[in-house]
């Protein structure tokens, strides 16, 4: 009975991740779905195990990505579309896989930095599709987007993936209030600093004389 409940719970995490992943794609991605999808996919990996989670999630995520991006991908045949969609999903799953494998070697709250670091560095090392599918594409909060002026779009992605790692660490350490509190405080301080920087920049860096009418 316990095994059945565990299986259903893990399936629930993956299902939620896939639903939010679907709404993260397409030509009108929903920003809240972009933030939530990694939380549940990471939860699925951490409860399931690296290899099993990878091979279960891979075909399902490929299907979701292909449905969400239908009509957007410039490939002449289904086989080519399937190949590149699969390759893209493999790239996107590697951080989850490696996080599950390596997290045991990382002490305490520092574990929260492993997943976002992997999620940013792996596409950089292996190559990616440029800004296609970038997390920042779904964001329309101008204060938050000011971070791009310093870090590029990778900074937005780091925050999104770090959120997933922080939420999962708090979930796992809910009986250890000290670690959960320290992780939460550190995350909120950084998020507040990023947002404050954005608000200040929006209010102080606007010069009408340096602007031009782009449309209308």
PLM regions: where:
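Membrane-embedded alpha-helical bundles of multi-pass enzymes
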Residues: 2-215
